[in-house]
Amino acid sequence: MQVSVETLEGLERKVTVSVPTEKVEEEVSSRLRNLARKVKIDGFRPGKVPFNVVKSRFSDSVREEVAREMVQSTLYEALQKNELVPAGYPHVEPLEIEPGKDFKYTAVFEVMPVFEVVELNQAPVELIQSEVSDKDVDNMIEKLREQNKEWHEVTHAVKKGDKVVIDFQGFLDDKPFQGGSAEGYELVIGSGSMIPGFEDGIIGGKIDKPLDIKVSFPEDYGHKDLAGKEATFKITIKKIMEGKLPALDEAFAEKFNIKEGGIESLKKDIRENMARELERRVNMMNREKLFDSLMSVNHVELPIALIDKEIEHLKHDMYHRLFGHEHKDDEKIPDFPRELFEEQAKRRVHLGLLFAEYVKKHEIVADNDKVNAMIDKFASAYESPDELRAWYQSSKEHMAEVEALVMEDMVADKIAEDAKLKYKNMDYDSVMNPKKGTEKKGE
Protein backbone atom coordinates (compact mmCIF):
# COMPACT_ATOMS: atom_id res chain seq x y z
CA MET A 1 0.00 0.00 0.00
CA GLN A 2 1.32 3.43 -0.97
CA VAL A 3 0.29 6.58 0.89
CA SER A 4 0.97 10.25 0.16
CA VAL A 5 -0.15 13.24 2.23
CA GLU A 6 -0.66 16.69 0.72
CA THR A 7 -1.16 19.82 2.83
CA LEU A 8 -3.95 21.96 1.44
CA GLU A 9 -5.25 25.23 2.88
CA GLY A 10 -5.13 25.62 6.66
CA LEU A 11 -5.84 22.36 8.48
CA GLU A 12 -7.05 20.55 5.35
CA ARG A 13 -5.13 17.48 4.21
CA LYS A 14 -5.43 15.26 1.14
CA VAL A 15 -4.40 11.65 1.59
CA THR A 16 -3.94 9.48 -1.50
CA VAL A 17 -3.93 5.71 -0.96
CA SER A 18 -3.04 3.12 -3.59
CA VAL A 19 -3.71 -0.60 -3.00
CA PRO A 20 -1.97 -3.07 -5.39
CA THR A 21 -4.26 -4.79 -7.88
CA GLU A 22 -3.01 -8.21 -6.72
CA LYS A 23 -4.40 -7.64 -3.23
CA VAL A 24 -7.67 -6.32 -4.64
CA GLU A 25 -8.18 -9.22 -7.06
CA GLU A 26 -7.27 -11.76 -4.39
CA GLU A 27 -9.94 -10.37 -2.05
CA VAL A 28 -12.59 -10.12 -4.80
CA SER A 29 -11.92 -13.69 -5.98
CA SER A 30 -12.01 -15.03 -2.43
CA ARG A 31 -15.41 -13.49 -1.80
CA LEU A 32 -16.81 -14.68 -5.13
CA ARG A 33 -15.67 -18.26 -4.37
CA ASN A 34 -17.33 -18.13 -0.95
CA LEU A 35 -20.47 -16.77 -2.58
CA ALA A 36 -20.49 -19.56 -5.19
CA ARG A 37 -20.66 -22.19 -2.44
CA LYS A 38 -23.94 -20.86 -1.02
CA VAL A 39 -25.68 -18.72 -3.65
CA LYS A 40 -28.99 -19.94 -5.09
CA ILE A 41 -29.66 -19.34 -8.79
CA ASP A 42 -32.53 -20.82 -10.76
CA GLY A 43 -31.40 -23.76 -12.91
CA PHE A 44 -28.49 -24.72 -10.64
CA ARG A 45 -28.23 -26.79 -7.50
CA PRO A 46 -27.00 -24.94 -4.37
CA GLY A 47 -23.21 -24.90 -4.38
CA LYS A 48 -23.00 -26.07 -8.00
CA VAL A 49 -23.25 -22.69 -9.73
CA PRO A 50 -20.30 -22.27 -12.16
CA PHE A 51 -17.78 -19.69 -11.00
CA ASN A 52 -18.01 -17.69 -14.24
CA VAL A 53 -21.79 -17.34 -13.75
CA VAL A 54 -21.31 -16.09 -10.18
CA LYS A 55 -18.58 -13.73 -11.36
CA SER A 56 -20.68 -12.24 -14.16
CA ARG A 57 -23.66 -11.68 -11.87
CA PHE A 58 -22.02 -10.53 -8.65
CA SER A 59 -18.60 -9.17 -9.56
CA ASP A 60 -19.66 -5.51 -9.56
CA SER A 61 -21.46 -5.63 -6.19
CA VAL A 62 -18.61 -7.60 -4.59
CA ARG A 63 -16.08 -5.06 -5.87
CA GLU A 64 -18.14 -2.22 -4.36
CA GLU A 65 -18.23 -4.07 -1.05
CA VAL A 66 -14.46 -4.69 -1.16
CA ALA A 67 -13.88 -1.02 -2.01
CA ARG A 68 -15.87 0.23 0.99
CA GLU A 69 -14.14 -2.13 3.40
CA MET A 70 -10.69 -1.44 1.98
CA VAL A 71 -11.22 2.29 2.44
CA GLN A 72 -12.11 1.73 6.09
CA SER A 73 -9.12 -0.50 6.82
CA THR A 74 -6.46 1.17 4.68
CA LEU A 75 -7.44 4.76 5.54
CA TYR A 76 -7.29 4.00 9.26
CA GLU A 77 -3.83 2.47 8.76
CA ALA A 78 -2.68 5.46 6.68
CA LEU A 79 -3.86 7.92 9.33
CA GLN A 80 -2.14 5.97 12.10
CA LYS A 81 1.19 5.76 10.27
CA ASN A 82 1.17 9.46 9.39
CA GLU A 83 -0.10 10.55 12.84
CA LEU A 84 -3.12 12.34 11.40
CA VAL A 85 -6.21 12.90 13.56
CA PRO A 86 -9.24 13.93 11.46
CA ALA A 87 -11.44 16.69 12.87
CA GLY A 88 -14.39 15.51 10.78
CA TYR A 89 -15.51 12.69 8.54
CA PRO A 90 -13.19 12.41 5.47
CA HIS A 91 -14.60 13.02 1.99
CA VAL A 92 -13.50 9.96 -0.01
CA GLU A 93 -13.55 9.45 -3.78
CA PRO A 94 -13.70 7.38 -5.90
CA LEU A 95 -14.98 4.13 -4.38
CA GLU A 96 -14.96 2.06 -7.60
CA ILE A 97 -12.44 -0.70 -8.29
CA GLU A 98 -11.56 -1.29 -11.94
CA PRO A 99 -10.48 -4.86 -12.79
CA GLY A 100 -6.75 -5.20 -13.36
CA LYS A 101 -5.89 -1.79 -11.88
CA ASP A 102 -4.61 -0.66 -8.49
CA PHE A 103 -7.37 0.59 -6.23
CA LYS A 104 -6.58 4.27 -5.78
CA TYR A 105 -8.63 6.76 -3.80
CA THR A 106 -8.24 10.14 -2.11
CA ALA A 107 -9.53 11.32 1.25
CA VAL A 108 -9.81 15.04 2.03
CA PHE A 109 -10.34 16.16 5.62
CA GLU A 110 -9.28 18.64 8.28
CA VAL A 111 -6.89 17.55 10.99
CA MET A 112 -7.05 18.46 14.65
CA PRO A 113 -4.72 21.38 15.37
CA VAL A 114 -1.45 20.64 17.13
CA PHE A 115 -0.32 23.34 19.54
CA GLU A 116 1.40 23.92 22.87
CA VAL A 117 -0.50 25.72 25.61
CA VAL A 118 0.79 29.22 26.35
CA GLU A 119 0.50 30.09 30.05
CA LEU A 120 -0.71 33.44 31.41
CA ASN A 121 2.63 34.11 33.14
CA GLN A 122 1.20 36.57 35.69
CA ALA A 123 -0.95 38.41 33.14
CA PRO A 124 -3.59 40.50 34.97
CA VAL A 125 -7.08 39.02 35.28
CA GLU A 126 -9.92 40.94 36.91
CA LEU A 127 -12.34 38.77 38.87
CA ILE A 128 -15.46 39.80 40.76
CA GLN A 129 -16.56 39.40 44.35
CA SER A 130 -19.96 40.02 45.84
CA GLU A 131 -22.04 39.38 48.93
CA VAL A 132 -25.69 39.53 49.96
CA SER A 133 -26.49 42.67 51.98
CA ASP A 134 -29.38 43.35 54.35
CA LYS A 135 -30.81 45.66 51.70
CA ASP A 136 -30.72 42.83 49.15
CA VAL A 137 -32.70 40.61 51.52
CA ASP A 138 -35.21 43.40 52.19
CA ASN A 139 -35.62 43.96 48.44
CA MET A 140 -36.29 40.26 47.95
CA ILE A 141 -38.89 40.32 50.73
CA GLU A 142 -40.62 43.22 48.97
CA LYS A 143 -40.62 41.31 45.68
CA LEU A 144 -42.28 38.39 47.45
CA ARG A 145 -44.87 40.73 48.92
CA GLU A 146 -45.55 42.15 45.45
CA GLN A 147 -45.98 38.64 44.08
CA ASN A 148 -48.44 37.84 46.88
CA LYS A 149 -50.59 40.95 46.70
CA GLU A 150 -54.28 40.55 47.42
CA TRP A 151 -56.24 42.10 44.56
CA HIS A 152 -59.71 43.65 44.86
CA GLU A 153 -61.82 45.38 42.23
CA VAL A 154 -62.09 49.18 42.16
CA THR A 155 -63.90 51.73 39.98
CA HIS A 156 -61.35 54.55 39.96
CA ALA A 157 -59.27 55.44 36.90
CA VAL A 158 -56.25 53.24 36.24
CA LYS A 159 -53.07 54.24 38.05
CA LYS A 160 -49.59 52.79 38.09
CA GLY A 161 -49.46 49.57 40.11
CA ASP A 162 -53.06 48.57 39.34
CA LYS A 163 -53.87 45.30 37.64
CA VAL A 164 -56.25 45.53 34.68
CA VAL A 165 -58.11 43.01 32.56
CA ILE A 166 -58.28 44.25 28.97
CA ASP A 167 -59.34 43.37 25.46
CA PHE A 168 -57.11 44.83 22.77
CA GLN A 169 -56.55 44.80 19.02
CA GLY A 170 -53.42 46.11 17.29
CA PHE A 171 -53.34 47.75 13.85
CA LEU A 172 -50.59 48.60 11.37
CA ASP A 173 -51.77 51.12 8.75
CA ASP A 174 -55.37 50.49 9.86
CA LYS A 175 -55.00 46.73 9.31
CA PRO A 176 -54.98 44.15 12.14
CA PHE A 177 -51.71 42.24 12.45
CA GLN A 178 -51.16 38.66 13.57
CA GLY A 179 -50.54 38.23 17.29
CA GLY A 180 -51.69 41.78 18.05
CA SER A 181 -54.95 40.98 19.84
CA ALA A 182 -56.16 39.38 23.06
CA GLU A 183 -59.26 39.15 25.22
CA GLY A 184 -59.34 39.02 29.01
CA TYR A 185 -55.63 39.83 29.20
CA GLU A 186 -54.31 40.55 32.72
CA LEU A 187 -51.67 43.25 33.00
CA VAL A 188 -50.03 44.99 35.95
CA ILE A 189 -49.47 48.63 34.97
CA GLY A 190 -45.81 49.53 35.39
CA SER A 191 -44.57 45.94 35.14
CA GLY A 192 -42.80 46.69 31.84
CA SER A 193 -44.11 43.47 30.30
CA MET A 194 -45.49 45.23 27.21
CA ILE A 195 -43.75 47.38 24.58
CA PRO A 196 -42.82 50.93 25.69
CA GLY A 197 -45.81 53.27 25.84
CA PHE A 198 -48.49 50.58 25.99
CA GLU A 199 -48.91 50.52 29.77
CA ASP A 200 -48.52 54.29 30.13
CA GLY A 201 -51.31 54.72 27.58
CA ILE A 202 -53.73 52.84 29.83
CA ILE A 203 -53.09 55.05 32.89
CA GLY A 204 -56.14 57.24 33.47
CA GLY A 205 -58.44 54.88 31.59
CA LYS A 206 -61.80 53.73 32.95
CA ILE A 207 -63.90 50.59 32.69
CA ASP A 208 -65.63 50.06 29.32
CA LYS A 209 -64.37 53.38 27.91
CA PRO A 210 -62.50 52.61 24.66
CA LEU A 211 -58.89 53.78 24.38
CA ASP A 212 -56.81 54.32 21.25
CA ILE A 213 -53.07 54.51 21.87
CA LYS A 214 -50.17 54.83 19.45
CA VAL A 215 -46.89 53.10 20.22
CA SER A 216 -43.76 52.18 18.29
CA PHE A 217 -42.22 48.73 18.35
CA PRO A 218 -38.51 48.76 19.33
CA GLU A 219 -36.00 48.56 16.48
CA ASP A 220 -34.68 45.28 17.92
CA TYR A 221 -38.14 43.73 18.38
CA GLY A 222 -38.17 39.96 17.86
CA HIS A 223 -40.58 40.00 14.92
CA LYS A 224 -38.81 41.76 12.03
CA ASP A 225 -42.08 42.68 10.31
CA LEU A 226 -43.04 44.76 13.38
CA ALA A 227 -39.63 46.13 14.45
CA GLY A 228 -39.48 49.92 14.37
CA LYS A 229 -43.05 50.34 13.14
CA GLU A 230 -45.78 52.51 14.66
CA ALA A 231 -48.96 50.69 15.69
CA THR A 232 -52.35 51.71 17.03
CA PHE A 233 -54.01 49.66 19.74
CA LYS A 234 -57.73 49.80 20.46
CA ILE A 235 -58.17 48.87 24.12
CA THR A 236 -61.21 48.23 26.30
CA ILE A 237 -60.70 47.97 30.07
CA LYS A 238 -62.95 45.25 31.48
CA LYS A 239 -61.76 45.28 35.08
CA ILE A 240 -59.49 47.37 37.35
CA MET A 241 -57.97 45.91 40.51
CA GLU A 242 -55.94 47.47 43.28
CA GLY A 243 -53.39 45.43 45.16
CA LYS A 244 -52.83 45.27 48.89
CA LEU A 245 -49.45 44.14 50.17
CA PRO A 246 -49.59 41.35 52.77
CA ALA A 247 -48.41 42.14 56.28
CA LEU A 248 -44.97 40.90 57.31
CA ASP A 249 -46.17 38.41 59.90
CA GLU A 250 -46.09 34.69 60.65
CA ALA A 251 -48.90 34.01 58.17
CA PHE A 252 -46.77 35.50 55.40
CA ALA A 253 -43.74 33.43 56.46
CA GLU A 254 -45.83 30.25 56.48
CA LYS A 255 -46.56 30.75 52.77
CA PHE A 256 -42.88 29.92 52.21
CA ASN A 257 -42.88 26.81 54.39
CA ILE A 258 -41.45 28.59 57.45
CA LYS A 259 -42.93 26.74 60.42
CA GLU A 260 -41.12 28.54 63.26
CA GLY A 261 -39.41 31.87 63.79
CA GLY A 262 -41.68 33.96 61.60
CA ILE A 263 -40.20 36.76 59.48
CA GLU A 264 -36.69 36.47 60.95
CA SER A 265 -36.50 32.80 59.95
CA LEU A 266 -37.84 33.71 56.52
CA LYS A 267 -35.13 36.34 56.10
CA LYS A 268 -32.48 33.84 57.16
CA ASP A 269 -33.79 31.28 54.68
CA ILE A 270 -33.93 33.87 51.89
CA ARG A 271 -30.38 35.08 52.64
CA GLU A 272 -29.05 31.51 52.46
CA ASN A 273 -30.78 30.87 49.14
CA MET A 274 -29.60 34.19 47.71
CA ALA A 275 -26.04 33.57 48.91
CA ARG A 276 -26.04 30.11 47.34
CA GLU A 277 -27.23 31.44 43.98
CA LEU A 278 -24.86 34.41 44.17
CA GLU A 279 -21.88 32.13 44.85
CA ARG A 280 -22.84 29.93 41.91
CA ARG A 281 -23.14 32.92 39.57
CA VAL A 282 -19.90 34.56 40.76
CA ASN A 283 -18.00 31.29 40.34
CA MET A 284 -19.41 30.87 36.84
CA MET A 285 -18.52 34.45 35.84
CA ASN A 286 -15.00 34.15 37.25
CA ARG A 287 -14.48 30.82 35.49
CA GLU A 288 -15.48 32.45 32.21
CA LYS A 289 -13.10 35.36 32.83
CA LEU A 290 -10.21 32.97 33.49
CA PHE A 291 -11.03 30.84 30.44
CA ASP A 292 -11.32 33.95 28.27
CA SER A 293 -7.94 35.16 29.51
CA LEU A 294 -6.28 31.86 28.64
CA MET A 295 -7.93 31.85 25.20
CA SER A 296 -6.70 35.39 24.55
CA VAL A 297 -3.06 34.23 24.69
CA ASN A 298 -3.67 30.94 22.86
CA HIS A 299 -4.61 31.53 19.25
CA VAL A 300 -5.68 28.15 17.89
CA GLU A 301 -6.61 27.38 14.28
CA LEU A 302 -10.14 26.00 14.45
CA PRO A 303 -11.36 23.15 12.21
CA ILE A 304 -14.41 24.22 10.21
CA ALA A 305 -15.82 20.71 10.65
CA LEU A 306 -15.93 21.16 14.45
CA ILE A 307 -17.49 24.63 14.12
CA ASP A 308 -20.17 23.24 11.79
CA LYS A 309 -20.90 20.42 14.23
CA GLU A 310 -21.20 22.86 17.13
CA ILE A 311 -23.52 25.11 15.11
CA GLU A 312 -25.81 22.11 14.57
CA HIS A 313 -25.84 21.48 18.34
CA LEU A 314 -26.74 25.11 18.97
CA LYS A 315 -29.54 24.93 16.40
CA HIS A 316 -30.94 21.89 18.19
CA ASP A 317 -30.73 23.74 21.51
CA MET A 318 -32.60 26.73 20.09
CA TYR A 319 -35.27 24.47 18.61
CA HIS A 320 -35.70 22.87 22.03
CA ARG A 321 -36.04 26.27 23.73
CA LEU A 322 -38.50 27.59 21.15
CA PHE A 323 -40.74 24.54 20.84
CA GLY A 324 -40.25 22.86 24.20
CA HIS A 325 -39.41 19.41 22.86
CA GLU A 326 -36.72 17.58 20.96
CA HIS A 327 -37.33 17.34 17.23
CA LYS A 328 -38.08 13.95 15.71
CA ASP A 329 -35.66 12.35 13.24
CA ASP A 330 -37.95 13.22 10.33
CA GLU A 331 -38.86 16.68 11.64
CA LYS A 332 -37.06 19.48 9.82
CA ILE A 333 -35.33 22.07 12.00
CA PRO A 334 -36.09 25.64 10.85
CA ASP A 335 -33.29 27.11 8.75
CA PHE A 336 -31.87 29.39 11.43
CA PRO A 337 -29.26 31.84 10.03
CA ARG A 338 -25.73 30.53 10.56
CA GLU A 339 -24.51 33.91 11.83
CA LEU A 340 -26.75 33.55 14.90
CA PHE A 341 -24.51 30.77 16.20
CA GLU A 342 -21.11 31.17 14.54
CA GLU A 343 -19.29 33.23 17.19
CA GLN A 344 -20.61 31.11 20.05
CA ALA A 345 -19.69 27.94 18.16
CA LYS A 346 -16.15 29.21 17.53
CA ARG A 347 -15.74 30.06 21.21
CA ARG A 348 -16.93 26.61 22.28
CA VAL A 349 -14.60 24.85 19.85
CA HIS A 350 -11.65 27.07 20.84
CA LEU A 351 -12.27 26.50 24.55
CA GLY A 352 -12.83 22.76 24.09
CA LEU A 353 -9.53 22.26 22.25
CA LEU A 354 -7.61 24.45 24.68
CA PHE A 355 -9.25 22.84 27.72
CA ALA A 356 -8.26 19.33 26.56
CA GLU A 357 -4.62 20.34 25.99
CA TYR A 358 -4.44 22.21 29.29
CA VAL A 359 -5.78 19.20 31.19
CA LYS A 360 -3.27 16.94 29.44
CA LYS A 361 -0.35 19.29 30.08
CA HIS A 362 -1.07 19.66 33.79
CA GLU A 363 -2.33 16.08 34.26
CA ILE A 364 -5.55 17.26 35.89
CA VAL A 365 -7.93 14.51 37.02
CA ALA A 366 -11.31 14.98 38.72
CA ASP A 367 -10.76 14.69 42.48
CA ASN A 368 -13.25 12.27 44.12
CA ASP A 369 -13.46 14.34 47.29
CA LYS A 370 -14.33 17.43 45.26
CA VAL A 371 -16.92 15.49 43.27
CA ASN A 372 -18.60 14.31 46.47
CA ALA A 373 -18.39 17.81 47.97
CA MET A 374 -20.11 19.28 44.92
CA ILE A 375 -22.89 16.68 45.13
CA ASP A 376 -23.32 17.55 48.83
CA LYS A 377 -23.59 21.23 47.92
CA PHE A 378 -26.28 20.49 45.33
CA ALA A 379 -28.11 18.24 47.80
CA SER A 380 -28.12 20.86 50.56
CA ALA A 381 -30.60 22.95 48.57
CA TYR A 382 -33.18 20.12 48.51
CA GLU A 383 -35.66 18.96 51.12
CA SER A 384 -34.49 15.35 50.66
CA PRO A 385 -30.71 15.61 50.14
CA ASP A 386 -30.13 11.85 50.40
CA GLU A 387 -32.45 11.24 47.45
CA LEU A 388 -30.48 13.64 45.27
CA ARG A 389 -27.18 12.05 46.29
CA ALA A 390 -28.57 8.63 45.39
CA TRP A 391 -29.81 9.97 42.05
CA TYR A 392 -26.32 11.15 41.09
CA GLN A 393 -24.62 8.00 42.33
CA SER A 394 -27.07 5.72 40.49
CA SER A 395 -25.85 6.71 37.04
CA LYS A 396 -22.43 7.04 35.41
CA GLU A 397 -23.85 9.78 33.19
CA HIS A 398 -25.03 11.82 36.19
CA MET A 399 -21.66 11.41 37.90
CA ALA A 400 -19.88 12.38 34.67
CA GLU A 401 -21.81 15.67 34.63
CA VAL A 402 -20.56 16.50 38.14
CA GLU A 403 -17.02 15.39 37.28
CA ALA A 404 -17.06 17.74 34.28
CA LEU A 405 -18.05 20.66 36.53
CA VAL A 406 -15.31 19.75 39.00
CA MET A 407 -12.79 19.62 36.15
CA GLU A 408 -13.85 23.12 35.08
CA ASP A 409 -13.28 24.38 38.62
CA MET A 410 -9.91 22.65 38.87
CA VAL A 411 -8.75 24.05 35.53
CA ALA A 412 -9.94 27.54 36.52
CA ASP A 413 -8.06 27.26 39.83
CA LYS A 414 -4.90 26.21 38.00
CA ILE A 415 -5.19 29.11 35.55
CA ALA A 416 -5.69 31.50 38.48
CA GLU A 417 -2.44 30.31 40.06
CA ASP A 418 -0.55 31.58 37.01
CA ALA A 419 -2.35 34.94 36.79
CA LYS A 420 -2.10 38.24 38.63
CA LEU A 421 -5.57 38.55 40.10
CA LYS A 422 -7.43 41.77 40.83
CA TYR A 423 -10.91 41.91 42.32
CA LYS A 424 -13.82 44.20 41.60
CA ASN A 425 -16.74 44.50 44.00
CA MET A 426 -20.20 44.16 42.50
CA ASP A 427 -23.54 44.36 44.26
CA TYR A 428 -26.07 41.55 44.16
CA ASP A 429 -28.18 43.04 41.35
CA SER A 430 -25.11 43.68 39.20
CA VAL A 431 -24.29 39.98 39.32
CA MET A 432 -27.75 38.44 39.20
CA ASN A 433 -29.38 40.99 36.87
CA PRO A 434 -26.55 42.46 34.76
CA LYS A 435 -28.84 44.72 32.73
CA LYS A 436 -30.34 46.30 35.84
CA GLY A 437 -27.53 46.19 38.37
CA THR A 438 -24.88 48.79 39.15
CA GLU A 439 -21.23 48.39 40.04
CA LYS A 440 -19.84 49.47 43.37
CA LYS A 441 -16.50 51.24 43.40
CA GLY A 442 -13.61 49.62 45.16
CA GLU A 443 -11.09 46.84 44.94
Curated annotation (Swiss-Prot):
**Catalytically driven reaction(s):** [protein]-peptidylproline (omega=180) = [protein]-peptidylproline (omega=0)
- The coiled-coil regions, if any, are none
**Main EC class the enzyme belongs to:** isomerase
Gene Ontology MF terms: peptidyl-prolyl cis-trans isomerase activity; protein folding chaperone; ribosome binding
EC numbers, comma separated: 5.2.1.8
- Annotated compartments: Cytoplasm
User: Taking every annotated instance into account, which residue ranges of this chain make up the domain PPIase FKBP-type?
Assistant: 161-246
Gene Ontology process terms (BP): 'de novo' cotranslational protein folding; cell division; chaperone-mediated protein folding; protein transport; protein unfolding
Q: Which GO terms describe its cellular component?
A: cytoplasm
Residues annotated as signal peptide: none
Which superkingdom is the protein from?
Bacteria
The alphabetized UniProt keywords are: Cell cycle, Cell division, Chaperone, Cytoplasm, Isomerase, Rotamase
Q: In terms of one coarse class, where is the protein primarily found?
A: cytoplasm
Using the chain's own numbering, where are the disulfide bonds? none
Q: Record's NCBIfam families? A: tig
Task: Tell me its family.
Answer: Belongs to the FKBP-type PPIase family. Tig subfamily.
Function text: Involved in protein export. Acts as a chaperone by maintaining the newly synthesized protein in an open conformation. Functions as a peptidyl-prolyl cis-trans isomerase.
PANTHER family named in the record: TRIGGER FACTOR CHAPERONE AND PEPTIDYL-PROLYL CIS/TRANS ISOMERASE, TRIGGER FACTOR-LIKE PROTEIN TIG, CHLOROPLASTIC
Q: What is known of its domains?
A: Consists of 3 domains; the N-terminus binds the ribosome, the middle domain has PPIase activity, while the C-terminus has intrinsic chaperone activity on its own.
Annotated protein name in UniProt: Trigger factor
